[in-house]
Amino acid sequence: MAKKRGDAPAPDPIPQKAARKSRGAAFAIVIVALLFVGTFGWWKIAHRDRSPAASPIQGAAQSSPAPASTSQPKPAPLLPPLLEPEAQVFARYAGSQGCRECHAAQFELWAKSNHGNAERLPDKVMDAAAFSPERTFHHGTQDSVATLKDGKPVVKTLGFGGAHERYPITRVIGHDPLRQYLVERPGGRVQTLEVAFDPKRNQWFDVYGDEDRKPGEWGHWTGRGMGWNAMCASCHNTRLRKNYDGAKDTYRTTMAEMSVGCESCHGPMKAHVEWRKQHPQTKEADPTVQKLTRDQTFDTCGSCHARRRELTGDFVPGDSFAQHFQLTTVDESDLYFPDGQIRDELYEYGSFHGSKMHTAGVRCADCHDPHAAKPRVMGNALCLRCHTGAPGQIPDSTVIAPIIDPVAHSFHKADSAGAQCVNCHMPVTTYMQRHPRHDHGFTIPDPLLTKEHRVPNACNKCHTDKDTDWALSATEKWWGDKMKRPSRERAQTVAAARAGTLTSGVPLLTLLRNEPNGYWKASLIRLLGAWSADAEVARAFLEYAQHPDPLVRTAAVQALESIGGPLGDAAQKVLARRTEDNERAVRVAAVSALRAVPDATSRAFRELMHALDLAADQPMGQLQKGAWAQANGDTAGALAHFEKAVAWDPNSGGIRNEFARLLSGMGRAEDTLVQMQEAVRLEPTQAEFRFNLALAWNEAGNIRNAVREFEEAVKIDPRHARAWYNLGLAHSALGKAAEAVTALRKGEDAEPRDARIPYARATIHARLGQRADAREAAQRALTIQPEYQDAQQLLRQLGQ
């Protein structure tokens, strides 16, 4: 039935994803975004999409997408492998023992270090205390036993099939402060026990505390979340090849050397060892050795000490980080606090990349002895090597660090905890119950950010008996206006963007223009993705896609995927050029963002497929492959991957939510509802899941249940504009005009840039004979979107 002018907008289904078009950087982080079909769903389901509407039906301002592709990339002809065969690679490695003769001092430091003991075989001396005498220990609701059987270590614990069994220990990872023990399984799998040993306390414990994980869960030690092959091996060994066979779901994992050997950081050195043997007396430099730059060394550290997406599974020292990884930065998630402090397990590289120290030219080896894997100097003396005003401490840098007197600067007594630089600027977070790690973001403690946005501050971490106001009063007294610094403004803006309280992208765009640090530029670009429909923001993405920093280019390229309108063609041209970028991270981002089906023989496409296959042993990897298949018209393939992801991690609400989107697009309303009900059961406080469940209920024809879930969504997230809008339409459909108007006004407050919300309200006012209110709402819609034809027609009917 044709809709009459002035009628309330019909609750339109979300159009299915066309021509692999999705928003923002979703693919790089999780998956290529999918669309969820629901009678009320006029917005793409993505967390807090704040893009303004450009048309009354189709959603955020975007160019008209090409028709959905039903063709598949042509099978690639036989081409050289992307990775060199491992036999050829491993033949270039000498092993750490080959370095000992000439580099004895460095070797001895390394052999005792956490790197030297990153992974090893069980040792009768080193592991004696853990297994003899027999120990029984309690964790959660479980009891486990560590003992020796025939002189070899075993652990009896809750394992496969829910039974307590004895598992022989075949390897050990970690050294200080904890050691984890490995169990070999069929299919080349190696699993990491969740019970670990603390050698200093001489105590067994569970790395997950009292979470009490059980068999069948992804994160239980028997699950994929504790699989050594995928989760541990690459950073505990030298030049590892995971060798996952997706067809058989098996591994053939190999490595050049067990543990983090010399060549993990220096690269393959067999040619050097042989050259030195042939030239024992010469003082000439070995022509086979490549001396790494400071940034190459930094990227080598980052290859393991970073939260990142792996693209190759084959990093080698000397290569750039961006040739092998896409770095996790501050974004809309809660992995980082808004000021850049770590919240989740993020390691050091990312935080340090965003620090003033990195911008000033400091690199890892300036502070850390790379062979001992410990600080070069302990205490404040390490920081004061630079912060005395003396130049020349940082090679190749003209930056002179500000002079710091620890007592005068900290307002704490000499040698007290509060006068230690690291306690304020590198606060500690403990992971795995026993592993304290310093934050490498070198942030400034700011109780105001604690009060406003719950960002932790070092003052209250120490002074646990004092409140935030006490700490805030002290910092304002001691430092006054110095606290009003750019990093505070940045943190406040990031927090506002995450909370959905920014009414435009201008504050973020201003910060982006003025930010000197590439890491933070990339972070701000990712946060700006919600405003990609704004022409100024889109032009910024086009500009920064050419930035010299690959981290910035990657973020900008990912953001270009959502650009439509007049700049859509320009965005696609830039993406096409970036598929030939000199860094793989950018190429992979670009080819995944292009609308056109890529050439299966192109380097960028093959690299993307390799990255997808590399992650295919994990549920999220299957989700990525499924999303790619669905985006390219292979619904059957997508379904197979999504079903596998759910089977591998049945307790993930997020995976079930994504699966529901696919099922909805296939018209399987009943199955969609089942998956969304399960997602909400697993994670009942996720507003987006409640919203999607409401859409699923409506697809099933139960509008009253849909209303209930929309209401739950806005209780959890009062700024969920899509939920308010759809709640308003649902109330209107039930004849509850007053409730509909109230909900739509809430939606306008939450998203003041979308013209459809006030237009929907205008139609309800008009139907009720409230002409003045109808004119006001229609006029508001036209203020937002002057070309909105339905609103123009309604105003004419109302006699403007």
Predicted regions and their residues:
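Primarily the internal scaffold of c-type cytochrome electron-transfer domains
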Residues: 63-67, 71-83, 88-90, 105-174, ...
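Amphipathic alpha-helical scaffolding segments comprising HEAT/armadillo-like alpha-solenoid repeats
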Residues: 502-512, 533-546, 565-579, 600-610, ...
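Structural marker of alpha-solenoid helical repeat scaffolds
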Residues: 531, 547, 563, 581, ...
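Structural signature of tandem alpha-helical TPR/SEL1-like repeats
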Residues: 534-536, 567-570, 601-607, 632-644, ...
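Helix-start (N-cap) detector for alpha-helical repeat units in TPR-like alpha-solenoids
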Residues: 550-553, 584, 619-620, 653-654, ...
